[in-house]
Amino acid sequence: MKLNDLSPAPGSRREKHRPGRGIGSGLGKTGGRGHKGQTSRSGGSIAPGFEGGQQPLHRRLPKFGFVSLKAMDRAEVRLSELAKVEGDLITVQSLKDANVIGQHVQRVKIMLSGEVTRAVTLKGIAVTKGARAAIEAAGGKFEE
């Protein structure tokens, strides 16, 4: 037996529907669309969320929340991610070059999560208290 000899068991697979191919198929003439009306026409689909003229759910419910523009240009970086950056001086640009943060980011804050394994110098980057203590314990320093 070879792969090209394999076939599904008889009766296990249904034949695909071919609408409009005779009354014996059960889908002749109108092709399962019924008589007249919007959905019987070609291209006659109804938009998602349309409720027949009743005010749709997504318009009945109130709006809420907003997107902070500050979140667009700020990023948080874990201590463990600093290992991805080559060199001892870490700046916003060096984090972008190492693909740790996105290209649109302008301000970065280092969070205490993971460990820092080498002494690094951070320039122009904000740091939490715990992260500052961990970096200084590893022999790192900060420049403004």
UniProtKB/Swiss-Prot annotation:
GO terms for cellular component: cytosolic large ribosomal subunit. PROSITE patterns: RIBOSOMAL_L15. Residues 21-31 have a biased composition (Gly residues). Disulfide bonds: none annotated. One of its GO terms (molecular function) is rRNA binding. Keywords: Ribonucleoprotein, Ribosomal protein, RNA-binding, rRNA-binding. Residues 1-57 are annotated as: Disordered. Pfam families: Ribosomal_L27A. One of its GO terms (biological process) is translation. It comes from the Bacteria. PANTHER family: 50S RIBOSOMAL PROTEIN L15, LARGE RIBOSOMAL SUBUNIT PROTEIN UL15M. Belongs to the universal ribosomal protein uL15 family. Part of the 50S ribosomal subunit. Binds to the 23S rRNA. This is Large ribosomal subunit protein uL15. It comes from Pseudomonas entomophila (strain L48). The gene is rplO.
